[in-house]
Amino acid sequence: MSTVAGPSTPAGTDERLMRTSPLRRLLGRPELGSVVGAAAVFIFFSIIADSFLRASSLGTVLYAASTIGIMAAPVALLMIGGEFDLSAGVLVTSSALVSSMFSYQMTANVWVGVFVSLLVTLAVGAFNGFMLTRTKLPSFIITLGTFLMLTGLNLGFTKLISGTVSTKAIGDMEGFDSARKVFASQWTIGGVEFKVTILWWAVLVAIATWILLRTRFGNWIFAVGGEADAARAVGVPVIRTKIGLYLGVAFAAWVSGQHLLFSFDVVQSGEGVGNELIYIIAAVIGGCLITGGYGSAIGSAVGAFIFGMTSKGIVYAEWNPDWFKFFLGAMLLLATLLNAWVRKRAEATK
């Protein structure tokens, strides 16, 4: 009996061992479209606004980007996991309100209020994750309900405790100055002021990127976002993963809330409404798919940077700020189309 051997494969050319070409690797990066968009926005405002290129403008743009980017990074991870959080914007305000009102009413060290706020904020995140995994309802419905409840609680408790829609000043209380150094300080480098939120942003993006690319939990995130049932079938802890993602969003909301409080000393109970959409937009511009299973934390940072350049570029160009929402919507559409095109090109090169 004879056998017919197939064509031999030269040593070192096994398809499984072949290195991916640089072009294929580049096209496969989720943030590619956002990087192109960021370059276009930078060039655009550099041409029409002379002050945009000043060194002092860099700190302003980065600060605007960081206030969005701190939240956009965990929101991006949540979207990669196939879920949304429409309560993220008001949760930032809730975090600030709890810290302020607890410290003021209990006449306690401000750090006690900050710690209580962390527990409350994480509890809200756990609630979102628990309700999502137990009820099987869409995250849109679950977090929309949380959004409405928090909006009412923020206003109702603030009026009940302080008698107005804003909190009382706590700037003279023990622990305020040290907390401000952690959450709302700034430093000067080369005559340019940089806010500490930029550092928080960089650290959170670095951690999120490490989780996605270097840990088992990162693999779980992509798996549950791609196909939760299939992921569950191969042993991925879907429930634990999704609750963990909501806890990540809650932690970032706590950081942002403390910055809000210690920057202005008082907090308006109606703040934060609508910001959840900006976080989602930054993640989508950065390459995250609405359907889940695809995206990156670095892309969310680029998306937030585009937000910062646009929001401040319009001011430097002396345009009416009302145009900002138009540009934001246009960038969302263009980024989505560009990301779809990049993905098709990446698939075509496989």
Question: Model-derived features: where do they sit?
Answer:
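Hydrophobic alpha-helical transmembrane segments
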Residues: 31-36, 61, 69, 90-94, ...
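Alpha-helical transmembrane segments within multi-pass membrane transporters and channels
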Residues: 107-147, 303-306
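Transmembrane alpha-helical segments in multi-pass inner-membrane proteins
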Residues: 253, 263-329
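Cytosolic-side transmembrane-helix boundaries in multi-pass membrane proteins
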Residues: 1-43, 47, 233-240, 310-350
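Hydrophobic core segments of alpha-helical transmembrane domains in multi-pass membrane transport
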Residues: 34-46, 75, 147-155, 200-210, ...
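Single transmembrane alpha-helix segments in multi-pass membrane proteins
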Residues: 41-106, 130-137, 283-298, 330
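Helix-loop-helix "hairpin" substructures at the membrane interface of multi-pass membrane proteins
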Residues: 108-117, 123-128, 190-267
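Transmembrane helix-bundle core of multi-pass membrane transporters
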Residues: 139-215, 243-244, 264-272, 347-350
